[in-house]
Amino acid sequence: MYHLGQDLPGNDVDDIEDLISADDVKPRERYENKKTVTVRAKKRSQIRLESQEEEEKPKPTIHESVIPGTQKVFVKTWGCAHNNSDSEYMAGQLAAYGYRLSGKEEADLWLLNSCTVKNPSEDTFRNEIESGMRNGKHVVVAGCVPQGAPKSDYLNGLSVIGVQQIDRVVEVVEETLKGHSVQLLQNKKKVHGRRVAGAPLSLPKVRKNPLIEIISINSGCLNQCTYCKTKHARGDLASYPPEEVVERARQSFAEGCCEIWLTSEDTGAYGRDIGSSLPELLWQLVEVIPEHCMLRVGMTNPPYILEHLEEVANVLQHPRVYSFLHVPVQSGSDSVLGEMKREYCRQDFEHVVDFLRERVPGVTIATDIICGFPTETEDDFEETMTLCAKYRFPSLFINQFFPRPGTPAAKMDRIPANLVKKRTKRLTDLFYSYEPYADRVGEIYTVLVTEVSHDKLHYVGHNKSYEQVLLPMRDNLLGTRVHVRITSASKFSMVGEILDDERDWTRCAKNQELPNVQVQTRSRERLIQRYFGIALVLGSLAFLIQLVVRLL
């Protein structure tokens, strides 16, 4: 198993449960994106100038006669933890075959893994494609955008890897470097009449963070939300067998991971297609979690968690499971939820939150809101405001509605943009009006330290409630459990001081850096030896043929 250093450009991918994303589209980027889609009349001189630029655009170098597996690849990812995991798998296969992962400037090929949830994400994805081609790079695209809309004009002529074909990334990259275009968008074959969830979980990985393993437990979902484009890409629910998920977790811990993230489009729906359930899987997983390591359950929609509330509450109280759940509500109005086809009402969501807060001490509930859905009235929005004011969620992801092509909601009459912005600002102001951690100063927690903060100034640990605690950067601190006292707090995190001496830190994972370098080197050596051997055999054969010809 290979691990990718955190400083590698293009590898800073934040998952949907993160509070602050370094990869979010900035206002300046959004402005640049808009410029690329503005329709305006062009003067003849402009057309001639653009034609000249097209002719001057550098062409990608064709690697027809170069040994495969010796080039450099840049990997960039947009979107959720599921996409992040897919990128780690693709990077792992490329590294295992000898390809070197690099920054964008020195790379021969760019592998771009896309997200189709929001318009700005697709806009930046499209701009990155254009940037790569403008700089003479080979480009391979992957993820939900090409899977959901493969006939998009800007994808013409590009190599495409479908969401269920990531185990074939090496052959796609090889052919692309030779100047060919390959498109693999088909679903995996069914096994015993059941749709397969995707590529095998046993594939090699290059992890974004060597301490964290992201496991996709299922692909697709059972819903038909009117605003969602991801359904077009990921399809209906397909779950991995529990024994495969458990084995992947066991292997990850053996390789030095100290935290597992379960991810999918809806973890609560897990197992319904294979006669299992999320609680059954969770109880099997806790049996293989080593002491001092942790498990985090990913996003689950209200309808399916309702059926298992008691069991889920029990699992979340387990000492090696974070007391955290991401349950997106999207709106506080039953009318809007009906138009969204969310298959639950506000009362259902409130029951989930109330039950978990009562049964699971210190539980953190994160949720999502869409502002400005086409049918949302002022009264509907007020219901959303009262819901958020009632629960004061510490993690609240606020999104403006984006009409995604091909979805039913895209055909509905839209609310004026200025009204959508006004509502978004009102909800954002409400969210920033309270400090969820203001009363924590002086509290003592045990935290698992697994990450580096976005500003690179702190290490990041999480307590049992998966609340973020910033710590001073000290040698050997990553991958340990330590006791901390909270000294200050902000909107999104707390700052702590370490109470333990270094000799008392509890290490939950062994150092994997040296073995990874050795394994990767051995992989390249085997590749070189293989081609050297082939060349030697061919050379000997040619010599024998010449000798026979001379004798005759």
Swiss-Prot record:
Iron-sulfur as UniProt keyword: yes
Amino acids binding [4Fe-4S] cluster 2: 221, 225, 228
Pfam families given in the database record: Radical_SAM (PF04055), TRAM (PF01938), UPF0004 (PF00919)
GO cellular component: endomembrane system; endoplasmic reticulum; membrane
Chain positions covered by the region annotation Disordered: 31-61
GO biological process assignments: tRNA methylthiolation
Domain of life: Eukaryota
CDD domains: Radical_SAM (cd01335)
Residue positions binding [4Fe-4S] cluster 1: 80, 115, 144
Topology with respect to the bilayer: Single-pass membrane protein
Family matches, as PANTHER family: RADICAL SAM PROTEINS (PTHR11918), THREONYLCARBAMOYLADENOSINE TRNA METHYLTHIOTRANSFERASE (PTHR11918:SF45)
Name of the protein in its database record: Threonylcarbamoyladenosine tRNA methylthiotransferase
Organism: Drosophila melanogaster (Fruit fly)
